[in-house]
């Protein structure tokens, strides 16, 4: 069973796998490369919204995840665009559509990743059954599980990055080499340090899901109008 974690970055997507004997990292710069990775991998944990609402501003899974991570970390969970706004050509139009349906405007943070959400949505709706392999997950939630539920320094601080690396290194010693190699090959403006540690923790939990039962938030998973699950996955 091939597993991996994928996080978005400025130049595309960062894929990491900790599969025994085939540990590796790859940068996926095109939709075609992402599609190929989705198709060839048996389980991907992805930090990107998948199932979308049609008229509700906030997905149930996002509201529950904010409570789960708690405190100032709740801001790491934001509401993605509703499906009618997904193909809007501009932020202004996406805002108008969002307000028409929900009476709330789309956050700029959500708009900035809308092209990536749209890319993932297109691939998952084009390839039926792919949604059973590609699963939405939340890195900060996974780090909290790794750290036995404790809150620690945020990722925008050096201490936060080092702490997260140490947590993963206890399970996968290769992470130091991966972190160094990626930083040597790519600038921070292309792949940020938090993108690297996020892809790593996603990869770790995807690997663990081979042996441990999958869990979801919420426990009962609802699907959107296109049949995509609105849930966060973890083990």
Positions of predicted regions on the chain:
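RNase H-like (RuvC/DEDD) metal-dependent nuclease/polynucleotide-processing core
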Residues: 1-3, 8-18, 22-235
